[in-house]
Amino acid sequence: MVPRLDFAEAAKGVIAMARFAGARGWVPATSGNFSVRMNELSAALTATGANKAELDENGVIEAEIAGAKHPRASAEAPLHLARYRAAPGIGAISHMHSMAATVLSRRHAGTGAVRLEGWELMKAFAGVTTHDMSIDIPIVPNDQDTDRLAALVEERLDKDSICPGYLIAGHGLYVWGASAAETIRHMEAFDFLLTAQLHEESAR
């Protein structure tokens, strides 16, 4: 179901995600961006250049999901808006640059995915009820043309996948959920799982 939030409510969710990531060092040097769907037409989105660790409502804009450009929108806004258009059940999206996600996105770029398998914390993802499975996190090559990159991402993603995120090679991680609260849970789970995966691979 598509949410029905006013701008102030949606902005609170954006701020919560941004500060959560900022407090953990996942959005260094003003990187990263966060959004919350308001309805079928609009989303609240971090403005370009905002310090995510100290974000307030002045650093959040209202963007049209159809894709009309906002003068303060981040260059990566098209990646958020394309996900909202493709999947009405998505209520919030985060983009962060955690160390493990960024390193693994380069290490596995040639295979096109990072495989998580057997980790108990995969059950933090919505719809996952067992550790006894594998989840492939797709990796797409980076591109400074973010409209083209957004189209590539949507072409690459498996619409039936249970994985609530994807990686951009050498860049970072996109994560989503039905709400800001669920997205925060997914962010924390991804960071733990990718850190565990990186440690395990490095120990081999």
From Swiss-Prot:
GO terms for biological process: L-methionine salvage from methylthioadenosine; pentose catabolic process. Pathway: Amino-acid biosynthesis; L-methionine biosynthesis via salvage pathway; L-methionine from S-methyl-5-thio-alpha-D-ribose 1-phosphate: step 2/6. Its EC number is 4.2.1.109. Binds 1 zinc ion per subunit. Its cofactor is Zn(2+). It catalyses: 5-(methylsulfanyl)-D-ribulose 1-phosphate = 5-methylsulfanyl-2,3-dioxopentyl phosphate + H2O. It holds the Pfam family Aldolase_II. GO terms for molecular function: aldehyde-lyase activity; methylthioribulose 1-phosphate dehydratase activity; zinc ion binding. This is Methylthioribulose-1-phosphate dehydratase. It comes from Parvibaculum lavamentivorans (strain DS-1 / DSM 13023 / NCIMB 13966).
